[in-house]
Amino acid sequence: MKRVGDYILDKRIGWGAFAQVYKGFSIKTNEPFAIKVVDVCRLADKNSKLTENLNYEIRILKELSHTNIVRLYDVLNEETDPTFIYMIMECCEGGDFSKYIRTHKKLTEEKALYFMKQLANGLKFLRQKQIVHRDLKPQNLLLSDDSEHPILKIGDFGFAKFIDPFSLSDTFCGSPLYMAPEILHRKNYTVKADLWSVGIILYEMLVGEPAYNSGSVPDLLNQLQNKKIKLPSHISSDCQNLIYSLLQIDVEKRISWEDFFNHKWLNLNNNDSYKNNSGNYFNNNNINNNNNNNTNNNNNNISYPISINSNNTNNNNNNNNNNNNNNNNNNNNNNNNNNNNNNNNNNNYYNNNNSPPNVYHASSLPYDFNNNNNNNNSNNYNNNTNVPNSLPFAYNNNIYSSPTEAIPQPTTLNKSKSLENTGNTIRAHPFKDDKKSTTIQQPQQQQQQQQQQQQQQQQQQQQQQQQQQQNRQLSNLSTDFERDLVILDGEELESMERVFNRAVAIAELGDLRQNEPLECVPLYILALKLMKSKIPNDPSSSPDKFINTFTEYKRKLVHIFSTSNTSVKNQDHHSSFSPNRFIYENALEFGKKGAVEELYNNYPTSLQFYTDGTLLLEYLSSIVIDSDDQEIIKKYLNAFEVRTQICKKNYENSKNTVLNTNSIQNNT
């Protein structure tokens, strides 16, 4: 166990590429905490945007003290090794809300109302602070304990930010299945985007699955355009009215925050109480009006990990919404903050258990990342006196109203400016060489021909740039998908034929495991999902080979599923089997077999093993998110490619040798 200040780090309960979360406890009080350990140097080196998100998370959590919001109690760092910071956070033993929904399948309307009231009260507090969350989903809602009536708490503020209620943002963030349509379409959006996410969460509580479910952004956009959601008839009319009001694609028609808080079904304004985790009752109105001077004082000690002005660190003195119950609900949560920013991927980067000689409050860490941006606070762009002026990276991320020229328009988000369309003419970039005047005068006719050729070339370049822009946008959308979804788009899967080959390679692994239905079925499903992702709305336009293979493996899947015993229908009986791990292990095994065949000069067989292994690794490369995992798979792919090229070359040489030998023999 490792000691950090007055806290002991015990069991690791979550990890990611840049941070880990430990179960910990206070040496003085023995209270449990979740301690998030962040490698800020590695984080900044990898992506400056992630550094900003960490700053926002700490800045926002510092401002918040509420029953229905996960608390940040302290931020520490080691004096001798400032590489890491330690975020001392509230520990929630009940896990995340998605696990609760999966366990209970569909919630009763009464239980859904119980949780929705708590979510609404937490969001009402955020609205009072002018904070938009931007990544609301069940995985980011935590439960205080495993009791019948746990307290729901909003967590993971990595994407959250302070925002003017009427300002627009064009930052693309959040989880697509819970993301508002205006964000998916990369349009400017307001605080109403969170209301869509609330509607999807409420729908999932009552129905057991998200209103729109897809493995790719294009398909999700298609569903939003064509699919109409239907609610079970047993849901009350008031509840149905709220869901339909929240899930309005047109932002103007979507319910407002004020109307949401005052909605008849939620009934937040009455004095009805609902039970808490201890079996007691607490009033809805008390949630937002409890004061606790001790917790408020704790917040004043919390500072930012990365080069932040500390002039306004006492902004919390204006916070009159603190809660008395926070310290009474700190329990060990093996899932707490597991979905926090940068904590979604498996990474064994941290293994150092040495105790530091000294730990102190991180009032001014020795980092100077993006220092120029921190000076923007001197500008008087913000007309809203309620928004803190000390927010880090204030204007380079469009936090609130600033001069129009400082806000990048969404239409030029990924657009190259080397050629810009200005009406009927094409204006060259001012730094282009073609802007220079020529000293030799050409004949008029020759000049006209030359100008026409240049215009044609410029138009072609412009079309290519527009196509590249669309491809980049599509790729960016897909990479933001949740890790448990298969990421399939035109950038990653180069062609229908390549998808077909990858799917068949996975399906053939299933063929080898037909005697183990619990392993065969997941592999078939994976292969069918892969093929289906490339079948257009009109299947008749697909190659016969593609459709026939899809149909054949679907038939095999149904046959195995229907003829096997009931255990195959309950994956919990064989939960240790991981299709992706099985694919990874077999890819490496194919590499070994290919190498053996290559040693014996069996080049055709060796090439087949290398090809199958490459296809499996390409599939894994298309779904993996963790940077370390990506690097490992990339190295294997490069090694397979090298051996494949050598095998092909040796195979051609061996064939030529045989031909030459036969030719000599014939001549003699």
Swiss-Prot record:
<dbReference type="GO" id="GO:0044351">
    <property type="term" value="P:macropinocytosis"/>
</dbReference>
<dbReference type="GO" id="GO:1990316">
    <property type="term" value="C:Atg1/ULK1 kinase complex"/>
</dbReference>
<dbReference type="GO" id="GO:0035891">
    <property type="term" value="P:exit from host cell"/>
</dbReference>
<dbReference type="GO" id="GO:0106310">
    <property type="term" value="F:protein serine kinase activity"/>
</dbReference>
<feature type="compositionally biased region" description="Low complexity">
    <location>
        <begin position="281"/>
        <end position="354"/>
    </location>
</feature>
<dbReference type="GO" id="GO:0010506">
    <property type="term" value="P:regulation of autophagy"/>
</dbReference>
<comment type="function">
    <text>Serine/threonine protein kinase involved in autophagy. Involved in the control of autophagic vacuolar cell death. Required for normal survival when exposed to pathogenic bacteria S.typhimurium by promoting autophagic degradation of intracellular S.typhimurium.</text>
</comment>
<dbReference type="GO" id="GO:0030587">
    <property type="term" value="P:sorocarp development"/>
</dbReference>
<dbReference type="GO" id="GO:1905037">
    <property type="term" value="P:autophagosome organization"/>
</dbReference>
<dbReference type="GO" id="GO:0001878">
    <property type="term" value="P:response to yeast"/>
</dbReference>
<dbReference type="GO" id="GO:0061709">
    <property type="term" value="P:reticulophagy"/>
</dbReference>
<dbReference type="InterPro" id="IPR011009">
    <property type="entry name" value="Kinase-like_dom_sf"/>
</dbReference>
<feature type="region of interest" description="Disordered">
    <location>
        <begin position="402"/>
        <end position="447"/>
    </location>
</feature>
<feature type="binding site">
    <location>
        <begin position="13"/>
        <end position="21"/>
    </location>
    <ligand>
        <name>ATP</name>
    </ligand>
</feature>
<dbReference type="GO" id="GO:0000902">
    <property type="term" value="P:cell morphogenesis"/>
</dbReference>
<dbReference type="GO" id="GO:0004672">
    <property type="term" value="F:protein kinase activity"/>
</dbReference>
<dbReference type="GO" id="GO:0097300">
    <property type="term" value="P:programmed necrotic cell death"/>
</dbReference>
<dbReference type="GO" id="GO:0034727">
    <property type="term" value="P:piecemeal microautophagy of the nucleus"/>
</dbReference>
<feature type="domain" description="Protein kinase">
    <location>
        <begin position="7"/>
        <end position="266"/>
    </location>
</feature>
<feature type="region of interest" description="Disordered">
    <location>
        <begin position="281"/>
        <end position="389"/>
    </location>
</feature>
<dbReference type="GO" id="GO:0009617">
    <property type="term" value="P:response to bacterium"/>
</dbReference>
<dbReference type="GO" id="GO:0005829">
    <property type="term" value="C:cytosol"/>
</dbReference>
<keyword id="KW-0418">Kinase</keyword>
<dbReference type="InterPro" id="IPR000719">
    <property type="entry name" value="Prot_kinase_dom"/>
</dbReference>
<dbReference type="GO" id="GO:0043457">
    <property type="term" value="P:regulation of cellular respiration"/>
</dbReference>
<dbReference type="GO" id="GO:0030435">
    <property type="term" value="P:sporulation resulting in formation of a cellular spore"/>
</dbReference>
<keyword id="KW-0813">Transport</keyword>
<dbReference type="GO" id="GO:0005524">
    <property type="term" value="F:ATP binding"/>
</dbReference>
<dbReference type="GO" id="GO:0000423">
    <property type="term" value="P:mitophagy"/>
</dbReference>
<feature type="compositionally biased region" description="Low complexity">
    <location>
        <begin position="370"/>
        <end position="389"/>
    </location>
</feature>
<dbReference type="GO" id="GO:0000407">
    <property type="term" value="C:phagophore assembly site"/>
</dbReference>
<dbReference type="GO" id="GO:0016236">
    <property type="term" value="P:macroautophagy"/>
</dbReference>
<dbReference type="GO" id="GO:0010629">
    <property type="term" value="P:negative regulation of gene expression"/>
</dbReference>
<dbReference type="GO" id="GO:0006995">
    <property type="term" value="P:cellular response to nitrogen starvation"/>
</dbReference>
<dbReference type="Pfam" id="PF00069">
    <property type="entry name" value="Pkinase"/>
</dbReference>
<dbReference type="InterPro" id="IPR017441">
    <property type="entry name" value="Protein_kinase_ATP_BS"/>
</dbReference>
<feature type="compositionally biased region" description="Polar residues">
    <location>
        <begin position="402"/>
        <end position="425"/>
    </location>
</feature>
<dbReference type="GO" id="GO:0008047">
    <property type="term" value="F:enzyme activator activity"/>
</dbReference>
<dbReference type="GO" id="GO:0031288">
    <property type="term" value="P:sorocarp morphogenesis"/>
</dbReference>
<dbReference type="GO" id="GO:0042742">
    <property type="term" value="P:defense response to bacterium"/>
</dbReference>
<dbReference type="GO" id="GO:0015031">
    <property type="term" value="P:protein transport"/>
</dbReference>
<dbReference type="GO" id="GO:0043327">
    <property type="term" value="P:chemotaxis to cAMP"/>
</dbReference>
